[in-house]
Amino acid sequence: MNTFSFNNKALYAESVAVTDLMVEYGSPLYIYSHAQIVSNWKKFDQAFGDHPHLICYAVKANSNLGVLNVLAKLGSGFDIVSIGELERVIAAGGQPGRCVFSGVSKTETEIQRALELGIYCFNVESAAELDRVESVAKLMSTKAPISIRVNPDV
């Protein structure tokens, strides 16, 4: 599927002329295709067949609320690197329980908030980070769901 095309030398996004969008919204502007996002996500999802999986969109790639909302409605998970990104996912209709918290600079406050909201798991990248997550979880009398991120080139 290609939702961007030319018709009589005019560029179209789905069935709308890009020049019409420029008149209405000004230029420059970003144009996203709902149909293309849905098509791409579904192809990726279907490639896993019956294997259990969670597709996590990297919010740092594009945190546009409209894009996040489309993905949330599809049941997507999200890869976040800050509480701000988690709050954007929630504002867009995403579920904290489908969010993986990555990144090496998680603060104790962020860890606590993520645990309160019930994230899917923390991607832990160092022993010091594991200690920090464990410490916060103990103070909250809970267990922190984790996965260990390994980079063999380091």
Annotate each language-model stretch with its function.
Residues P145-V154:
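Flexible glycine-/small-residue-enriched beta->alpha junction loops
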